[in-house]
C-alpha cells in the first residue's frame, strides 16, 4: 500500500510512522515521513517536507526500535521545503518556516526559520491554514 500511495501522490509515509487525527498535507509532492516519526493531531505539512532520521544505516539491525525521526506535537505547521531531522520534538502550536532545517528541539509556541533554524517569533496567536473561525474579526 505504501509504494502504491507514493506512486499516486508523491508522498512517502513509512508504514510504522505514527500519525494523529486531522493530518493535513497540502500539495504533498515530495513529502517524506520516516519510520519512527510521530505526528500529533491537527498538524499541517506543506510540500517537499522531510521528517528524516540522521543516524547512518551502517548496521540497520542495530537501529531497530531506536527513535531516529522527529516528533511533531499537536497543532504544528511545517512550511514547504522544511527539513526536520533527527529524534527531536517540535512542541505544540509551533510554526516552522519554509526551507528551514531543524535539528534541535523546538519549544511550545515558537516560530522558527532559517538554516539552521532559529527562533524568529512567537506563535502564540496560532495559524489556521485556510480557516476563518470568526475569531479574526476586528473588535
What is the role of each PLM region?
Residues 53-60:
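Conserved catalytic-core motifs characterized by acidic clusters
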Residues 60-69:
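Regulatory activation segment
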Amino acid at each position: 500500500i505504501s509504494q502504491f500511495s507514493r506512486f499516486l501522490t508523491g508522498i512517502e509515509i513509512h508504514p510504522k510512522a505514527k500519525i494523529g487525527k486531522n493530518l493535513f498535507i497540502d500539495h504533498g509532492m515530495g513529502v517524506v515521513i520516516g519510520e519512527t516519526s510521530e505526528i500529533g493531531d491537527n498538524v499541517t505539512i506543506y510540500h517537499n517536507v522531510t521528517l528524516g532520521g540522521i543516524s547512518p544505516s551502517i548496521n540497520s539491525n542495530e537501529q531497530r526500535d531506536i527513535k531516529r525521526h522527529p516528533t511533531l506535537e499537536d497543532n504544528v505547521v511545517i512550511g514547504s521545503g522544511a527539513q526536520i531531522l533527527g529524534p527531536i520534538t517540535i512542541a505544540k502550536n509551533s510554526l516552522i518556516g519554509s526551507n528551514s532545517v531543524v535539528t534541535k528541539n523546538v519549544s511550545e509556541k515558537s516560530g522558527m526559520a532559517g538554516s539552521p533554524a532559529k527562533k524568529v517569533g512567537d506563535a502564540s496567536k496560532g495559524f489556521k491554514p485556510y480557516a476563518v473561525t470568526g475569531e479574526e474579526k476586528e473588535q
